[in-house]
Amino acid sequence: MPKRDAPWRHMAGTSKVSRSGNYSPSGGMGSKSNKANAWVNRPMYRKPRIYRMYKSPDVPKGCEGPCKVQSYEQRHDISHVGKVMCISDITRGNGITHRVGKRFCVKSVYILGKIWMDENIMLKNHTNSVIFWLVRDRRPYGTPMDFGQVFNMFDNEPSTATVKNDLRDRYQVMHRFNAKVSGGQYASNEQALVRRFWKVNNHVVYNHQEAGKYENHTENALLLYMACTHASNPVYATLKIRIYFYDSITN
């Protein structure tokens, strides 16, 4: 004997909803995306042992949340003699862009922007490379040292720059990268995009002053050195540098 239909089946505008249906926004993409998502988001016990042994924590050791951020937006005139800027200048305060006490940890650095040439320089046939160095100053004092004071170069060429022997204990190059632009009448590449993201886990220590300045650092200041390889044609850099940091629990 067949079962009698439920009364709501004959009502207009109603339909039975299946419990086993997949009504997620990505459900129409097929089973391939579901399998891929399931594989990416698989539980930790299904991953290789190296993922379980060397998993880095979200919050650095000895620190507490929330994750704070500070941005440095500036247009730089990069020449052959080099330029330096401090990217760990954090003012003391209670905001999401301030440090609570003397100590904090810069977990990551994000550099975004472009390098470009002036219209007059763009018409000259030449190639110019801009080199960036992310340097940790372990014992900052006074004002940041110039590019030529920190790096030793052969024939004053920035592409051969290495930290001087007597400063290797104080200055440590954490990352280095370069970008290239070229000028000319026909095949010119007048600008180049810059995008870098690094995990540094750099523990910065300030003195009792509240202002975020290089002179108030006592340990591990982060410096960004910039220099171009062409001696007579400068390059401009429009950069937005973000650092993500956590306050120390010992403040």
From Swiss-Prot:
| Predominant location | virion
In the record, biological process GO terms are:
symbiont entry into host cell; viral penetration into host nucleus
Keyword terms of this UniProt record:
Capsid protein, DNA-binding, Host nucleus, Host-virus interaction, Metal-binding, T=1 icosahedral capsid protein, Viral penetration into host nucleus, Virion, Virus entry into host cell, Zinc, Zinc-finger
What superkingdom heads the lineage? Viruses
Q: Where is this region: Disordered?
A: 1-35
Where found? Virion; Host nucleus
Q: Name one GO cellular component term.
A: T=1 icosahedral viral capsid
Zinc finger residue extent: unnamed? 54-71
Tell me which InterPro entries the record gives: Gem_coat_AR1, GV_A/BR1_coat, Viral_coat
Where does this protein have compositionally biased stretches of type Polar residues?
A: 15-35
Family according to the record: Belongs to the geminiviridae capsid protein family.
- What does the UniProt function comment say about this protein? Encapsidates the viral DNA into characteristic twinned ('geminate') particles. Binds the genomic viral ssDNA and shuttles it into and out of the cell nucleus. The CP of bipartite geminiviruses is not required for cell-to-cell or systemic movement.
Q: What is this protein called?
A: Capsid protein
* Protein's organism: Bean golden yellow mosaic virus (isolate Puerto Rico-Japan) (BGYMV)
